[in-house]
C-alpha cells in the first residue's frame, strides 16, 4: 500500500514539475572513454570512442589488415570517423588506412610531416587526395577538437633524418578527467628523450608501447616519466623477437600490468573518468 502511494505521489510530482528527491532519481550512465587496441598482428590499430561520441582511429595495421579494422568498426556500428591519425609512414601502421578510408567516411586526417615516404605511405596520401581530405600536420602542441577530452600531440617535437621515420611518429596524449593515455606510434629512444627534454605531458596510466616492444624504445628513463599502470603491446608473430624481454622487464619493474595482443587478442580499456576496466 505504501509503495502504491509513493508511486502516485511521484507521478504527481513529475506532472507538476516538482523536483524529485535524489534518492528517487534513476542515475544516468556516466560517459566513458573506450580505447580498443585491435589485434592486427604485427602492427598497430587503435580505435577511440570519446565520451561525447567522436570516433578516432590511429593506424590500421599493414596492407590487408584494413579489412579487419573495417569489420571491427562496423560491428560497433561506427558510421564515420571524426579523426584519423597516421602515426608515421611504416607499412604496419598506415598500410591498412586506405581500405578504411574507402569503406568508412573520414572527416579529418592527421599525419606527421616526415620527409620519408614508403610505398604504403604514398598509397595513403593518394587515397586521401581521392577522398579530398587535407592531411593536417601532427606535431607537438597540436590539439585535437574532441569535446570533454584534452587530446594533444606531444611529439614529434623536432625534425629527424629522412631515414629516421620511427622518431617522426605522432605521439598523442589523451586525458579524460583523471583517465590518461599515451599513444606512442613507433617513437624510439631518441624521440623519447627529446619529449622529456621538451617537458611534454607524458604521464599516463595507459601506455601504448612503441614498436611492438622493441628494445629500441620504451627506455627506463621514459617509463619512469610516464609511470604507466597498464602497458599494451600490439604485436603478432614476427622474426624480430618482439616484444623483447628487456622491454617487458622494464615495464614490470615499473609495476605496469602488461597486455599483449598476440596473447590477449584485442584489448579494450574503458575509463569512467576516475578508474579503468579492461576486457575484450
Language-model region placement:
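Non-globular, low-confidence helical/coil segments that flank catalytic cores
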Residues: 2-280
Amino acid at each position: 500500500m505504501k509503495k502504491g502511494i509513493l508511486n502516485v505521489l511521484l507521478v504527481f510530482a513529475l506532472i507538476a514539475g516538482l523536483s524529485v528527491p535524489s534518492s528517487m532519481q534513476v542515475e544516468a550512465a556516466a560517459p566513458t572513454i573506450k580505447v580498443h587496441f585491435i589485434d592486427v598482428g604485427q602492427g598497430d590499430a587503435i580505435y577511440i570512442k570519446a565520451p561525447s561520441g567522436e570516433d578516432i582511429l590511429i593506424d590500421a595495421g599493414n596492407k590487408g589488415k584494413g579489412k579487419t579494422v573495417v569489420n571491427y568498426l562496423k560491428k560497433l556500428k561506427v558510421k564515420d570517423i571524426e579523426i584519423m591519425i597516421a602515426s608515421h609512414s611504416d607499412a604496419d601502421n598506415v598500410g591498412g588506412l586506405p581500405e578504411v578510408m574507402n569503406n568508412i567516411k573520414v572527416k579529418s586526417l592527421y599525419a606527421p610531416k616526415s620527409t620519408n615516404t614508403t610505398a604504403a605511405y604514398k598509397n595513403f596520401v593518394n587515397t586521401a587526395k581521392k577522398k579530398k581530405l587535407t592531411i593536417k600536420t601532427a606535431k607537438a602542441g597540436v590539439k585535437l577538437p574532441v569535446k570533454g577530452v584534452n587530446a594533444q600531440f606531444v611529439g614529434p617535437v623536432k625534425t629527424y633524418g629522412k631515414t629516421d621515420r620511427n622518431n617522426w611518429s605522432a605521439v598523442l596524449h589523451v586525458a579524460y578527467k583523471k583517465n590518461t593515455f599515451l599513444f606512442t606510434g613507433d617513437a624510439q629512444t631518441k624521440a623519447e628523450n627529446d619529449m622529456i627534454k621538451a617537458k611534454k605531458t607524458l604521464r599516463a596510466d595507459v601506455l601504448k608501447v612503441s614498436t611492438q616492444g622493441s628494445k629500441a624504445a620504451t627506455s627506463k628513463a621514459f617509463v619512469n616519466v610516464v609511470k604507466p599502470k597498464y602497458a599494451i603491446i600490439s604485436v603478432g608473430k614476427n622474426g624480430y623477437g618482439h616484444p623483447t624481454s628487456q622491454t617487458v622487464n622494464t615495464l614490470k619493474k615499473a609495476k605496469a600490468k602488461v597486455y599483449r595482443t598476440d596473447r590477449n587478442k584485442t584489448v579494450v580499456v574503458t575509463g569512467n573518468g576516475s578508474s579503468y576496466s579492461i576486457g575484450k
